[in-house]
Structure formats: C-alpha cells, structure tokens
Amino acid sequence: MKTRLTLILVLLIYIGAASHTHAQQKKVIKTMMIAGQDGSHYWQGACEAMKQILENSGMFKVDFAFTPDFGGDIATFKPDFHQYDLIVINYGGATWTEPVRKNFEKYVADGGGVVVIHSSVVPMADWKEYNEIIGMGAWDGRNEKDGPYLYWKDGQYVYDYSPGYAGYHGLQHETVIEHRAPHHPILQGLPPQWKHFKDEIYTRLRGPVRNMEILATAYERGRHEPLMWTVSYGKGRIFVDLLGHCGNDPYSMRCTGFQVTLLRGCEWAATGAVTQEVPADFPLKDTYTLRPEFKAPFHAYPKTKH
C-alpha cells in the first residue's frame, strides 16, 4: 500500500513539473507597440505587419498604443509601460510629456526591453535620455553637439567627431547585410552576409553612442554604416533596427531577413536570450527570400515538431 501511494505521489509530482515546464515554454511576451504622428511613413501598415510577424510566431501578444494625430494634445498619451515585457517603438512625432518620459526611462533602467524600428531614431532629439537609449539618431536638428558619427572600418569602430548634420538616405534599393557580432544571441547561427529586399537605408547617424554594440552594417556611400545595434541602459536591453521602411506598402518587411532578425531582436530585448531556430528559408548573400504573409512557411523550421 505504501509503495502504491509513493508511486502515485511521484506521478503527481512529475505531472505537476511537466505542466509547469509546459506553461513556462508557452509564456507569451507581452508587447506594447507605440506609433503615430509620422508623416513620412505609412505607420499604420507597418504596425499591422509587425503585429502579424510577432503574433504569428506564437511568442508575442501585441497591444497598440497610438499617440494623438498631429496637432492633438500629446498630454493625452499616457501608456503604462510597466505592464509589458517589451516596448516596440515605431514612432515619428512630438516629444512625449515629462511624466511619460520619466516613466519610460525608469522602465528601461529597471530592465524593460525596447526595440526601435527605422524612423523611430528621428524624433525627440530634445530628449537627452532617449538619445542615450537609442545610441544615435538622425535629422530633427541633430549635429556635432549630439555626438560623433559611428561606422565600421577594418574590423573596428570609427568615431567621427567632424561637424555636420545627422541623417541621410538615398533611393530605396536592395542591399547586403554584413554581421559584425556573429556570436551575439540575435545573430547566432545566421549566415554572416545576406541580401535584404528593397528598403530605405539610413546613414550618417550620430549621437552619444555609449554602451553600444554594432550587430550589422551595410556598405553605403563609401563606408560600412551600422544598421542594427544594441544598447545597454541601466538593466535594460535595447535593439535598434534601421530596416523596415513603409511608404505606401510594408514591402521591406516581407523580407525573411527582416522578419527573423526582428523576432530574435524582440525576444532578446525582452528576455536576454534567443531560443529560436535558424530557419531554412533565411536569405543568403546573393539571394533574398520573402515571407509575404508575414509568417514562417511550414518548411522553415524542419526540427520543430508540428
């Protein structure tokens, strides 16, 4: 009788542990996506595309936090950052109010995850801590007073303190992305070079460039310009991705490379680790691949049991 009770007890403990492990594996990353007031981009389409990319992975649940339209009262924008594991910024408008700025700074410093997409490096140049959080930015009056240009040359960072404005882009085009920190969790196992579909490539960014690690660059206008990087701010992890232009259509976001690095960057920013497999459809140096439905095809993860 005692042996039988012991076996039952062991079985119950095993079932409980297995259920707990399963629950941990299924934990969804609560994500707030901030957007609005960007007259140069179809931010609504970009938000919907990224929401699909994130939620189709099964790892994220995305809520939108939109600011008022241009001319509206920015004081009505009062997001509760601390309810979320991750904040994705897809924003290009007015500087947030001081209480919101302070709450955001605390959220990040306390360990919150942040992902900054494309033109979100442009606004709020007058907010010192935002510049620290994003590492470097473009336009919006930025120049040598805000910090140096940063680019990659001969395996090293180059800090260029020469005077000049921040920010430039030419016509949209395909480009080859080169990884500069291949052992970082976001890039671990991915091809070191891959072709990205047509996009608007930002160059000549400048800023405080503190606590930054360049992840990837592209060769533009005679030098290797950073396109992806991370920043540490207090206990917080920030992933900045300059890819993802959305004019009338989010076609750049259909690129498999964009989607995979976005997913991996979001997971890393939220948790400090990346658990995702390297997909079979990831692009190579000479060939881009697309996921037009903003989700992985069935064959992309052959090791995963469906």
What is the predicted role of each segment?
Residues 1-5:
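Positively charged n-region of N-terminal signal peptides that target proteins for export
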Residues 6-17:
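Bacterial N-terminal signal peptides
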Residues 19-23:
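Boundary at the C-terminal end of the N-terminal hydrophobic targeting segment
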Residues 24-26, 30-34, 38-124:
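Helical hinge/lid and interdomain linker segments adjacent to catalytic or ligand-binding clefts
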Residues 25-29, 56, 79, 211, ...:
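Extracellular ligand-binding/catalytic regions of CAZymes and related secreted enzymes
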Residues 34, 94-185:
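A glycine-rich, often tryptophan-bearing local segment used as a flexible ligand/cofactor-contacting loop or short
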Residues 37-40, 118, 164, 172-174, ...:
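Active-site rim elements
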Residues 55, 61, 153-237, 301:
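Catalytic beta-strand/loop cores that center a nucleophilic Ser/Cys/Thr
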